[in-house]
């Protein structure tokens, strides 16, 4: 029997580029992560992009990635890139760094 995709925990590292700083992107990301039950963190990078670590079920992560492709209304996302990460670490909450 195949494992239930909503039970296995996935961890994704994501970079979001575009107009994503100074537009409430991190704050909105925290709100969306809480709404979806995602754990991890989000942070600004010096190059003007935003990075995030997402942890949750496949369905939760997919829904969060879909939201990140647009972000909050003031954001202008031009690129979302990421990769699944293998880790034993389990985040307790979703935080803004």
Swiss-Prot record:
Pfam family, one: Acylphosphatase
Regions annotated as coiled coil: none
Family of this protein: Belongs to the acylphosphatase family.
Single GO MF descriptor: acylphosphatase activity
Catalytic residues of the enzyme: 26, 44
EC number: 3.6.1.7
Catalytic activity: an acyl phosphate + H2O = a carboxylate + phosphate + H(+)
Keywords: Hydrolase
Domain Acylphosphatase-like: 11-97
UniProt-listed InterPro entries: Acylphosphatase, Acylphosphatase-like_dom, Acylphosphatase-like_dom_sf, Acylphosphatase_CS
Annotated disulfide bonds: none
Biased segments, Basic and acidic residues type: 82-97
Annotated region (Disordered), positions in chain: 76-97
Domain of life: Bacteria
Name of this protein: Acylphosphatase
């Amino acid at each position: 029997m195949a494992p239930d995709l909503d039970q296995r925990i996935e961890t994704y590292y994501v970079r979001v580029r575009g107009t994503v700083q100074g537009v409430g992107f991190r704050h909105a990301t925290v709100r969306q992560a809480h709404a979806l039950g995602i754990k991890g963190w989000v942070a600004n990078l010096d190059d003007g992009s935003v990075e995030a670590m997402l942890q949750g079920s496949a369905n939760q992560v997919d829904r969060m990635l879909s939201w990140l492709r647009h972000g909050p209304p003031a954001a202008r996302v031009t690129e979302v890139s990421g990769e699944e990460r293998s880790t034993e670490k389990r985040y307790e909450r979703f935080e803004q760094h």
